[in-house]
Amino acid sequence: MAIIAITGQKGGIGKSTITANLAMEMATLGHKVAIIDTDPQKSLVSWAELGEGFLSKYVQPLDTTHPVTFKQKVIALAKAADRVFIDTPPGFADQALLAALLADVVLLPAGPSPLDILAARAALTLARDARARRGGKKPFVRFIPSRVTFYTNLGKGLSSSLEDLGEKVLPPIGQRVAIAEAALTGLTVLEYAPGSVASEEFATLAKAVEELIK
């Protein structure tokens, strides 16, 4: 059993995209998954409602207004599913901290712009706070280079910039048309464009996260 929180203090960095597609890839590895959407705007729920694929079966909203109740529900889900994903909204530090306090792994997507790096630093501080409160062992914290344009200098240097913040960096996810098109249909990339570069990137990321959990 593992609880995986995807957090960040800035919007538009791919948190929901990574949550959805990483959960899909974990399911293909044989895991029973649950996906929790804590965003008041219900981004993942809205995505799932666009189609009748994987997300429509596994995404559920969960209110964080009452932390004790939230914790109880997450733990209950974790007993039924061996990979529980928590997608947190941007700019809501309380929700992100709450998720991090429950998580085995905190994933921090970050884009290549200077503002993205600053936001990643803030998200890292919060994740480390959660780890300190839990005795310094968990959650494991990893950056994910997200929405990367590999042909630009910013894109090429993103992994290095994130490593400089002091935590390990997982394989990147590129800025891919297939990702956006899949979301418009309510599907994950694996469902929409199996065998695509985007799908392969998420498969590689899932294997890296799986190794971390083991």
Region annotations inferred by a language model:
Residues 189-214:
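NTP-binding/hydrolysis catalytic cores, primarily Walker-type P-loop NTPases
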Residues 18:
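Hydrophobic positions on the alpha1 helix immediately C-terminal to the Walker A/P-loop
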Residues 95-114:
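Inter-motif core of Ras-like GTPase G domains
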Residues 32-33, 84, 139-141, 169-170:
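Hydrophobic anchor at the start of a short beta-strand
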Residues 2-3, 7-9, 13, 22-97, ...:
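P-loop/Walker-type NTP enzyme "switch/lid" segment
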Residues 149, 159-188, 202:
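Beta-strand-loop-alpha "switch" segments that mediate conformational coupling across diverse proteins
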Residues 120-135, 146:
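Conserved C-terminal guanine-recognition region of P-loop GTPase G domains, centered on the G4
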